[in-house]
Amino acid sequence: MASVGIIGATGYVGTEIVRLLQNHPDINITSVVSHNFAGQKISDIYPNLKNVFEMECDELDIDKIADKAEVFVTALPHGISKEVIPKLVEKGKRIVDHSGDFRYKSVEVYEKWYNATHGMPHLLKLSAYGLPELHREEIKNAQIIGNPGCYPTCSILALAPLVKNRLVDTKNIIIDAASGVSGAGRKTDLPYQFCECDENFKAYSVSNHRHTSEIEQELSLLAEEEITVSFTPHLVPMKRGMLATIYANLNCEKSTSELIELYKEYYKNEYFVRILDEGKLPETKFVAGSNFIDIGLVVDKRLNRVVILSAIDNLGKGAAGQAVQVLNILFGLPEHRGLTNPGFYL
């Protein structure tokens, strides 16, 4: 059995990784690490794990935990990883990191959008961007994998076939995306309290959300030219799920059916990418609890514009599910191993 340690196991992303891996046929969780809950059973913190997975949480001490696992998943806040990842690298461990620290090719871009100094620029050469559908070979050979953000995953995969085939105006792409509240993590900040979120729908970080730069980086690599996007995130009063509505002006005449066939061909070997037939559009209830992304589109002939819609679970394909997909790659397993569960629907 392959062995994995989860550092930051008691946050929403961490515990979702536990939920997915505890029943994985080929990967064994050998350490769960939580600074705040060290010495307590994780099932005491999350009672849904009672009688299923009751491992005691380790303290965050790399010297003590390093030998427990071959690969470590770090689910820590941005910037905090610099206290952990270099030590794991020194001990020869591979890491799947959920912070933004290893998602960027450029230190300058990271520091501009995160308004922080990158604490580990010397390690970027060891890293790969963890979106398997676009960077599978790089992931196989990397020591550190920067797990993508949820909004970028939902947006990049929705746009990739159009951008790669140079079918849209690359200077006028608009992305409106809405996320469930779990995307903010397990914290007590006022904007995420029940009375602030319930029966409320709001935009935030308009024109300056840090995921803008992540989306632009990956689309620019695909297009082999600089791409800029207008990205606006929204908060939806639901626990999990994400829906992106993307507008792009076509630079040639294409029908809805032609573009759907293009998408199906582009993603024909990608198990987790589901391209919907003409007349059908994604909904969050179809993907919540799964690692799938559903993509649908409509061409507005009047404006010669394509509207692409994509849906993921922000905790699934947007975080924990994608991390398990990456772990499968690192261990030489089929990517769908342990991830074939459908969405909850209800």
UniProtKB/Swiss-Prot annotation:
Q: Which InterPro entries match?
A: AGPR_AS, AGPR_type-1, NAD(P)-bd_dom_sf, NAGSA_dehydrogenase, Semialdehyde_DH_NAD-bd
Pathway membership of this protein? Amino-acid biosynthesis; L-arginine biosynthesis; N(2)-acetyl-L-ornithine from L-glutamate: step 3/4
Q: Where in or outside the cell is it found?
A: Cytoplasm
- Chief location of this protein? cytoplasm
Gene3D superfamilies attached here?
Dihydrodipicolinate Reductase, domain 2, NAD(P)-binding Rossmann-like Domain
Q: Where are the transmembrane segments?
A: none
Active-site residue numbers: 150
Q: Name one GO biological process term.
A: L-arginine biosynthetic process
Which SUPFAM superfamilies has this protein been placed in? Answer: Glyceraldehyde-3-phosphate dehydrogenase-like, C-terminal domain (SSF55347), NAD(P)-binding Rossmann-fold domains (SSF51735)
List the molecular function annotations (GO) for this entry.
Answer: N-acetyl-gamma-glutamyl-phosphate reductase activity; NAD binding; NADP+ binding
Gene Ontology annotations for the cellular component aspect, listed alphabetically: cytoplasm
Under Enzyme Commission nomenclature, its number is: 1.2.1.38
Catalytic activity as recorded in UniProt: N-acetyl-L-glutamate 5-semialdehyde + phosphate + NADP(+) = N-acetyl-L-glutamyl 5-phosphate + NADPH + H(+)
Among its keywords, does the record have Zinc?
no
Question: What keywords were assigned to this record?
Answer: Amino-acid biosynthesis, Arginine biosynthesis, Cytoplasm, NADP, Oxidoreductase
Name of the top EC class for this enzyme: oxidoreductase
Q: What does this protein do?
A: Catalyzes the NADPH-dependent reduction of N-acetyl-5-glutamyl phosphate to yield N-acetyl-L-glutamate 5-semialdehyde.
Family according to the record: Belongs to the NAGSA dehydrogenase family. Type 1 subfamily.
Q: What is this protein called?
A: N-acetyl-gamma-glutamyl-phosphate reductase
Encoding gene, per UniProt annotation: argC
